């Protein structure tokens, strides 16, 4: 029943870079617990136990070859952004669960080699990011706002908080 398996990724300063991905936050999806201290237990202990998420980052993702082939692998139209989200959603659609093993920790220098795609809005990187953003939004639509592993009463602006009315 397990699809993709991810790990807790840490920045060099021992804060969390990734411990699962929540759909809908930031428009498409966002890593949760960004900048939390390494030893923080997280919302209801999510950082201290393995936990199901709709997606885990491709920066450290394990999946069996059979399941990878079953869902036709990674989408070639998504060269950089959201290819992991798309892949994880294809696994969910097939009935698999994606899980983040938060006791497995690795250091990750996020985007160190390629930089930030959204800084220079006149760059080819930015244009590609916008195309990939639109592609994933068109393909998955409503699923991006109905994360089955995230409480619908919580905010889509920032993870694990209530919106103020």
Locate the predicted segments by residue.
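Conserved donor NDP-sugar-binding/catalytic core segment of glycosyltransferases
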Residues: 1-28, 97
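C-terminal, non-catalytic tails of nucleotide-sugar-dependent glycosyltransferases
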Residues: 13-14, 25-53, 57, 62, ...
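Short glycine/serine/threonine-enriched helix-capping/active-site loop
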Residues: 5-8, 101-102, 109
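Small-residue-rich loop/turn and linker elements
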Residues: 9, 113-114
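Histidine-centered active-site/metal-ligand motif
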Residues: 31, 108-109
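Active-site mouth of glycoside hydrolases
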Residues: 109-110, 119
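A short, conserved alpha-helix in the catalytic core of glycosyltransferases
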Residues: 45-72, 77-105
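Activation segment
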Residues: 13, 71-72, 110
């Amino acid at each position: 029943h397990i699809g993709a398996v991810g790990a807790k990724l840490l920045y060099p300063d021992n804060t969390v870079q990734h411990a699962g991905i929540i759909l809908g936050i930031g428009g498409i999806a966002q890593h949760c617990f960004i900048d939390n201290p390494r030893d923080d237990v997280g919302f209801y202990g999510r950082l201290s136990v393995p936990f199901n998420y709709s997606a885990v980052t491709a920066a450290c993702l394990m999946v069996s070859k059979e399941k990878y082939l079953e869902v036709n692998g990674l989408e070639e139209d998504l060269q950089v952004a959201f290819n992991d989200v798309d892949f994880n959603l294809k696994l969910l659609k097939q009935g698999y669960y994606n899980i983040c093993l938060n006791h497995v920790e690795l250091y990750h220098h996020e985007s160190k080699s390629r930089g930030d795609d959204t800084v220079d809005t006149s760059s080819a990187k930015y244009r590609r990011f916008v195309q990939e953003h639109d592609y994933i939004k068109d393909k998955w639509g409503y699923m991006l706002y109905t994360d089955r592993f995230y409480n619908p009463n919580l905010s889509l602006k920032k993870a694990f908080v209530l919106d103020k009315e």
